[in-house]
Amino acid sequence: MAQELDFETKVFEKEIIEVAGTKEAIVRGGRHLLPLLPEALQGVSTIGVIGWGSQGPAQAQNLRDSLAGTDITVKVGLRAGSASVASAREAGFNEEDGTLGDMFDIVRESDFAIVLISDAAMAEHYEEIFAALKPGATLGLSHGFLLGHLDNEGATFPENVNVVAVCPKGMGPSVRALYVQGAEVNGAGINASFAIQQDVDGRATDHALAWSVALGSPYTFQTTMQSEYRSDIFGERGILLGAVHGLVESLYRHFREEGAAPEDAFRRSAESITGPISKTISHHGIIGVFEQLDAAGKEIFNRAYDVTYLPMKAVLQEIYDEVRSGNEIRSVVVAGSRLERYPMPTIDQTEMWHVGETVRAARVEEEIPLDPFTAGAYCATMMAQIDVLDEAGHPLSEIVNESVIEATDSLNPYMHARGIAYMVDNCSVTARLGSRKWAPRFDYAMVQESFPALDAAESETKASSSFVGHRIHDVLDKVGQLRPSVDIFVAS
């Protein structure tokens, strides 16, 4: 059963929505709310954004732009000798006016310290960060990873600070891109979840909501920090990055083995997912993909769905169990030191991705096929992820954002523009590690289980029989009304 959470805000308008019989409290965003930010950020004169990885540049610039004309200053803190100093200067932060400095100095100066360094760096430096926090300050995180690490270590947050999370449901570049591209469209941006881990002065909720509104979130929904990190780490290893990578690699080879030309195999696999399938899901839900097909196409969709759902769900359940147990967090922490000796290799060197460069160069968007087999396999994997999260009791908004909206509105457009590496490697180190680790498992599941099952007269399971009536379609219909008000544009 999905969690039902509620909160109180002194500044913003809370709205109760009902999705599939479950009530959720949300706040709709929009630039008309920006004048409320100083009131919501009561007690805050300096916001420090620590780190300049995937989320740092987007969040620092969005916060600065949203707070322009107020008495609240946004500063960026980076480690000594950081290679990102030049990029931060180019974005308008500099030492001369005090908006760029050493990370620990900026933490000490901040009333609201938003720490966006890599998870491995967080695990290494959290004690120094905690020591630098002002008593009564608000510590902001965009990922609950640190809570999981503290639990593993038997440690806790300092008792004299607020601890909140605002977690955009998309990679950092898309958080900035939709904010800029939607400058004239009220509410454009990336949806976000928020969580309150500690509230020492009664201001934590409004601080978190103000942060989310300032980032441009069309709507902000509540979760817990534990639920967030479990769904987030799981999701990026699943359909958001790892699963879709493994799936398209296996589909490409499958179509080639059936006799398809390289370009056609790429169009039917990767292009079909990042083009018409993603666009249809974004605007009409997962069920919309099925409804677009003719009778023959629906039969192929169902066949692909039936042979894909259980093998992919088994891998997804294993990932969720590894995250819940703390093992996946430990793996990321250990990888932090290993990466200095063994940097992550590229992931776009197979035939498929070289063919993709040629296909994209000659692409006619309207001619990309919605392949029914690919659609069935992709939707089955997405639904399997939804079911794993639902069975674990996650909030419904969190489920659809981590499994559907983030995929179609934030991540897949980057693969569509420039290929798999451009999508995966614009994400956090934790996401990049997880995608590389688990993508081969999804590929293996398709090759060893799903494709051989096609030769059987009938699938042993009829997973597709529960697809059309699944309650997630009603949830997506409701939540889809709150989607970003513009479609992201990613230059190829």
Segments from the language model and where they lie:
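Rossmann-like NAD(P)-binding element
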Residues: 3-6, 79-80, 89-148, 156-174, ...
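Small-residue helix-packing motif on alpha-helices
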Residues: 74, 85, 106, 122, ...
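Glycine/serine-rich phosphate-binding loop and adjoining beta1-alpha1 elements at the start
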Residues: 1-46, 78-79, 196-198, 213-222
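NAD(P)-binding Rossmann-fold cofactor-contacting core
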Residues: 16-17, 64-93
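Glycine-rich adenosine-cofactor-binding loop
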Residues: 44-63, 363, 382
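Rossmann-fold dinucleotide-binding core
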Residues: 141-237, 295-296, 325, 336-367
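NAD(P)-dependent Rossmann-like dehydrogenase/reductase catalytic/cofactor-binding core
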Residues: 2-31, 188, 249, 257-492
